[in-house]
């Protein structure tokens, strides 16, 4: 019983307080791993775009700091997040790279049920999450695409203490991004991409606790077919890098995932559709589950 109640507190510490603005009990920081996949480091050419993320996450497993399922916990997590992102890549160049600006505000539904012998927590909400805005630089070379970004998550969504499934996190998070896509062959039919993000979390306004910082790596290997279809394997690694304050646990949360992705381009309406499935494994001090993602991108 004592271990089970401690596990519930651990779940909240890593999966809710440090939950993302696109909360689905998946992320260690604001950023949700698995948002990007194939050619995730490649930004588009100058123009206006709307990119609509749809994420479904479910989990029935809570792992210990050793990466093992904690016995006695009956966990049921489900989240759907819809996040329209407006992207403007300008014609302005800085250090040879195109300057870009983008922003998103997610809509989130989350249901959480945790049962242990002698204790139970159940909650579900739908609401608006935290605002994110950033500036980017992007380069398109003969065999490489490069990108840099600096942005910030603002606590515009509702949050509370004690913790709940409310969509807001209640803290600011600067986030820095760097990525590269390598086109292996001259025809650019094979690609390998890596996208890194680092989050510096600040004090949570309701609990006065500062979550630990987080590093996320998303990667993808893909083959282009008929110039309009990409098939590939994608994955991510997310690692909490510092303890929370005050008196944060020494057990830093982490998780990895892998799965397939397909991207389809529709040239006439200038629209792109991508679908990916990611299976999580090696989770420590957090929930471990499955992610389905449908992303629609439209150029104007």
Regions found by a protein language model. Name each.
Residues 27, 40-47, 91-100, 140-146, ...:
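Short loop/turn motifs that connect adjacent beta-strands in outer-membrane beta-barrel proteins
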Residues 27-28, 57-81, 115-124:
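Surface-exposed strand-loop-strand hairpins of Gram-negative outer-membrane beta-barrel proteins
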Residues 40, 52, 84-88, 133-139, ...:
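Residues on the lipid-exposed face of transmembrane beta-strands in outer-membrane beta-barrel proteins
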Residues 48-50, 97-105, 133, 146-152, ...:
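Transmembrane beta-strands of outer-membrane beta-barrel proteins
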Residues 56-60, 88, 105-111, 139, ...:
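Transmembrane beta-strands of outer-membrane beta-barrel pores
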Residues 69, 204-300:
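Outer membrane beta-barrel transmembrane domains
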Residues 76-84, 122-131, 168-174, 209-215, ...:
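Residues that define the transmembrane beta-barrel architecture of outer-membrane proteins
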Residues 147-151, 158-243:
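Detector for outer-membrane/organellar transmembrane beta-barrel domains
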């Amino acid at each position: 019983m004592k271990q089970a109640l401690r596990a519930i507190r651990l779940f909240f510490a890593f999966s809710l307080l440090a939950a993302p603005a696109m909360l689905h009990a998946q992320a260690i920081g604001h950023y949700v791993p698995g948002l990007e996949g194939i050619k995730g480091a490649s930004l588009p050419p100058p123009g206006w775009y709307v990119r609509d993320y749809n994420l479904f996450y479910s989990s029935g497993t809570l792992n210990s700091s050793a990466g093992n399922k904690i016995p006695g916990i009956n966990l049921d997590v489900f989240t759907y997040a819809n996040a329209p992102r407006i992207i403007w890549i300008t014609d302005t160049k800085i250090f040879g790279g195109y300057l870009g600006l983008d922003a998103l505000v997610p809509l989130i539904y989350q249901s959480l049920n945790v049962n242990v012998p002698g204790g139970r927590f159940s909650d579900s909400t739908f609401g608006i999450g935290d605002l994110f805005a950033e500036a980017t630089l992007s380069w398109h070379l003969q065999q490489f695409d490069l990108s840099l970004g600096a942005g910030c998550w603002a606590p515009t969504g509702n949050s509370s203490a004690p913790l709940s499934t409310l969509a807001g996190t209640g803290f600011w998070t600067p986030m820095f991004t760097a990525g590269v896509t390598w086109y292996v062959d001259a025809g650019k039919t094979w690609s390998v991409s890596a996208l890194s993000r680092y989050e510096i979390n600040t004090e949570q306004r309701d609990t006065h606790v500062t979550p630990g910082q987080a590093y996320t790596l998303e990667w993808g290997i893909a083959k282009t077919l008929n110039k309009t279809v990409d098939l590939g394997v994608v994955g991510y690694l997310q690692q909490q890098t510092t303890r929370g304050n005050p008196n944060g646990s020494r057990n830093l949360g982490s998780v990895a995932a892998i799965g397939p992705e397909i991207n389809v381009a529709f040239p006439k309406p200038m629209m792109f559709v991508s679908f990916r499935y990611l299976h999580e494994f090696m989770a420590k001090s957090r929930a471990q589950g499955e992610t389905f993602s449908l992303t629609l991108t439209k150029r104007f």
